[in-house]
């Protein structure tokens, strides 16, 4: 079943705004890296391209969030009469919060793919082109992983 993104529903509007803001905050970090550590003076590469990457990261976190929300809704319907777990650790509560999973997945994957592709492409290209290539490659990988998570984890099986 394809994911339906409920942008304006009362239940998810605050979560969507949080995902949008956190995706933008991650790109501010990469804009800072590009301008000050890599000395990229081209404003198109250092500011406008990360805005496009911001939209791609937001969309991938939204896809992952919606797939986890779908599974959570299904589990709530199934586990209405089960016993509740009394004690859980703070890190488990933090990781079970529905917004943290997609944010952590996308940010960790983006950082891994960005720095690995940047260090490989810096051997052959200039700083500006290597930064641009690394951002685009890592955003594409994040979208592919979000699609895989949506297909494998968020699948609703009808019996």
Predicted ranges, named:
Residues 1-33, 149-159:
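Cytosolic-side membrane-entry/anchor segment at the start of a transmembrane helix
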Residues 16-24, 47, 51-55, 107-111, ...:
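Alpha-helical transmembrane spans of integral membrane proteins, capturing the lipid-embedded, hydrophobic core
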Residues 17-28, 33-71:
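Hydrophobic alpha-helical membrane-embedded segments
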Residues 24-30, 100-132:
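Alpha-helical transmembrane segments and their membrane-interface junctions
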Residues 25-29, 57-65, 116-121, 141, ...:
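Alpha-helical membrane-inserting segments
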Residues 61-74, 147-159:
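Juxtamembrane/interface segments at transmembrane-helix termini
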Residues 77-103:
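Short membrane-interface loop/juxtamembrane segments of multi-pass integral membrane proteins
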Residues 126-159:
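Alpha-helical transmembrane segments and their immediate juxtamembrane interface regions
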């Amino acid at each position: 079943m394809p994911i339906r993104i409920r942008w304006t529903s009362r239940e998810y509007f605050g979560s969507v705004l949080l995902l949008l803001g956190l995706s933008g905050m991650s790109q501010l970090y990469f804009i800072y890296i590009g301008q000050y550590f890599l000395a990229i003076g081209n404003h198109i590469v250092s500011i406008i391209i990360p805005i496009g990457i911001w939209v791609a990261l937001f969309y991938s976190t939204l896809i992952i969030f919606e797939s986890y929300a779908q599974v959570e809704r299904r589990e709530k319907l199934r586990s209405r009469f089960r016993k509740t777990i009394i004690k859980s650790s703070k890190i488990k509560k933090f990781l079970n919060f529905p917004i943290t999973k997609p944010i952590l997945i996308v940010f960790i994957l983006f950082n891994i793919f960005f720095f690995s592709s940047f260090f490989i492409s810096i051997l052959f290209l200039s700083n500006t082109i290597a930064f641009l290539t690394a951002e685009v490659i890592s955003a594409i990988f994040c979208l592919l992983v979000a699609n895989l998570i949506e297909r494998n984890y968020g699948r609703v099986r009808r019996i």
